Design a protein with these regions (language model features):
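N-terminal Sec/ER secretory leader and immediately downstream segment
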Residues: 29-108
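Aromatic-patch recognition
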Residues: 73-196
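Sec/Tat signal peptide C-region and signal peptidase I cleavage site
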Residues: 20-24
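Long, compositionally biased interface segments
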Residues: 196-243
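Hydrophobic alpha-helical bundles in membrane proteins
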Residues: 4-5, 25, 39
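A generic structural signal for short, non-catalytic loop/turn and secondary-structure boundary residues
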Residues: 8, 65, 179-181
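Bacterial N-terminal signal peptides
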Residues: 8-17
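Bacterial N-terminal signal peptides that target proteins for export
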Residues: 1-9
Length: 243
């Protein structure tokens, strides 16, 4: 583990003290957190997660700003039911402190696997087969699809809410030129463990020998769900291929 991720409760909250009202309140929060965290405490001894103060439309998170409950592997231990999110700009997993607006960040190497809601994620360190950061994994069989999401801080004087930035911001401001744009990259992992990047629905189906049957199965699903998202399309293809 890198030294920057081994902070005691005292040093962690010393970093936060400048943003909190008074030392007595800081100490009270430290004590309350230590009591509530219990054997999870080591999970929270990380560097404080970034709190972006720049004025920009959108947000830097994977899907939404709020935290969701999930399970996470950290230093070989599995921790259940902790509030997790992903900073897609910095490619860091965020774990929210108990009863606090603050979070700690974990690198991909230190958070190799976790769940957020129904999603399953893996952390990829430098030199891996996939881009460094976090990817969501689809599929339970011998083949998988990996979805890598990252955010970029961009600038545009036009109204780019919605498709141009990749998602809709209900609080979009036309007088703000900077925004967090989203990018999504998909990879196919075959049964031998080889990765290949693909773009589009047909490209995924071409990865399989039994593509004719898979295409028929997926078309039947699309007739029932004409607005099937690309992620759900990937899951449907993998489910059909596993039959």
């Amino acid at each position: 583990m890198k030294k920057s991720l081994i902070l005691t409760f005292g040093s962690l909250f010393a970093l936060l003290a400048g943003s909190l009202p008074a030392p007595a309140q800081v100490q009270a929060e430290v004590q309350a957190f230590q009591q509530s965290a219990g054997d999870r405490s080591i999970l929270y001894r990380g560097k404080r997660g970034a709190r972006y103060t720049i004025l920009a439309n959108g947000h830097p998170y994977w899907a939404q700003p709020g935290f969701e409950r999930g399970d996470i592997v950290f230093e070989g231990n599995l921790y259940y039911d902790v509030p997790i999110n992903i900073d897609a700009l910095a490619q860091r997993a965020l774990v929210q402190l108990q009863d606090s607006p603050f979070s700690v960040e974990l690198t991909p190497e230190n958070a190799p696997a976790f769940t957020i809601g129904d999603g399953h994620f893996v952390g990829i360190g430098p030199g891996g087969a996939l881009p460094e950061g976090f990817s969501e994994v689809f599929g339970d069989g011998p083949v998988h699809v990996y979805k890598h999401v990252y955010k970029l801080l961009s600038s545009n004087t036009q109204n780019v809410n919605g498709d141009p930035i990749g998602y809709y911001d209900p609080d979009y401001r036309n007088d703000v030129t900077r925004h967090f744009a989203i990018r999504k990259v998909y990879y196919f992992r075959d049964a031998e463990g080889n990765f290949s990047r693909f773009k589009g629905r047909s490209a995924l189906i071409r990865q399989f020998q039994d593509r004719k049957r898979i295409r028929q199965d997926v078309k039947a699903i699309q007739r029932r769900q004409p607005d099937l998202s690309f992620d759900d399309f990937c899951k449907a293809v993998l489910h059909s291929a596993a039959q």
